[in-house]
Amino acid sequence: MTTHDPHLLTLRTLAAPLLESPNPLARLNELTLSAQGAAVCGHILIDLLEEHDLAIGDYDLVIAPEGDAALAAAMIHAAGGRGLDLDAALFLPAQGPASAINNAEGERRFSGSPLSGRTAVLLANSALADGEEILAAASEYGTEIVGCASLLPDEAARTFAASAGIAYCSPALGD
C-alpha cells in the first residue's frame, strides 16, 4: 500500500530492522524508548484508531499490558500534542506494585489512571495472551474496551478482537 503519511513513512523506516529481527517485540521496545520512535508510534496508533472511527473522545483511556508502557506513554504524549486528553492504565500480573488497583480478590490488576466507568482501547503488542483476562478485569470496573491497536500485525490479536467484537487495527508496514 502506497502512502504519503509522514508518520507512517517514518515508522516504516524505523521498523525495518524490527521486522527482520528474530525478536521483534524486544526491538519494538527499543523503538518506543527512542525519542523519534516514541513520537511517531503514538501518532500512528491514534491515527489508526481514527481510521477505524475511534477518535479520542470515543475513548479516554488506553489499557496496555505492562510490557507496552512506553507505547501507552507515546499515545498520551501524542494526544497532548493535539490538545487532547488521554490517560493510561497498565495491566499487571497478580503480584503488581502496591499502587495498583485491586480486584475483588485483592489481586492487583492495573496501575495508572482509574478505570471506573471509562471507555478504553487496548494495546496489543506484547502479552495479548492476557486479552480475555484484561477484558474481564476491565469490565469489573465498568470499563468498556472498544478497540485494539497494534504496531506489529498480529493474527492472534486480530482473532481476539474479532471474538471480543471490537475493532482491530495495525499499520501496513510493507510498501
Role assignments for model-derived ranges:
Residues 69-72, 131, 154-158:
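Short, well-ordered alpha-helical microsegments
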Residues 54-56, 111-116, 140-141, 160-162:
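Solvent-exposed alpha-helices and their adjacent loops that cap or buttress functional pockets
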Residues 47, 51, 77, 81, ...:
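Short, well-ordered alpha-helices that flank and scaffold nucleotide-derived cofactor binding pockets
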Residues 1-56:
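Active-site-facing substrate-recognition patch
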Residues 73-133:
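Short, glycine/charge-rich flexible loops or terminal/linker lids adjacent to PRPP-binding catalytic cores
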Residues 2-13, 137-175:
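PRPP-dependent phosphoribosyltransferase catalytic core
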Residues 56-67, 149-150:
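Short glycine-rich phosphate-binding loop at a beta-alpha junction
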Residues 60, 118, 146:
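Conserved acidic residues
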